[in-house]
Amino acid sequence: MKHLKALAVLVSFVLLTTAISAQTKAPKITVSPEKVLHPYPVQMKGTGFSPKSDVLSHLRRPDGTEFRILQMYTNNKGEIDHEIDTIVMVPGVYDLWVEDPKAKTTSNVAHFEVTHDPKDLEK
């Protein structure tokens, strides 16, 4: 009986630790390609967000100003997939991150560069 209680406490601890670490894990986004020739698109993918929830995408221009915040909806796995149109973008490096208001978390900041010169893609 004593061993059963100890086992129950251990199992409860492991489950609680797993639940806490799953809740505190920050969402992650990636962009592809990281350097793109204007006017071709950039693909953004994200994981680790609250499932079936609204998230807020932020995109900062090379001059430090931000585009209008874009609201997106995650799938049942907490994933997002979005194509970024570069047609109105000037050359330079852009910063992208996504907020998850429900979980009160923010993704990493991903960067991509828009260029008008095809030679820049060879570097």
PLM segments and residue spans:
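Bacterial N-terminal signal peptides that target proteins for export
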Residues: 1-11
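Extracytoplasmic/secretory-pathway segments with low complexity and glycosylation-like composition
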Residues: 20-123
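Hydrophobic h-region of N-terminal signal peptides that target proteins for export
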Residues: 12-20
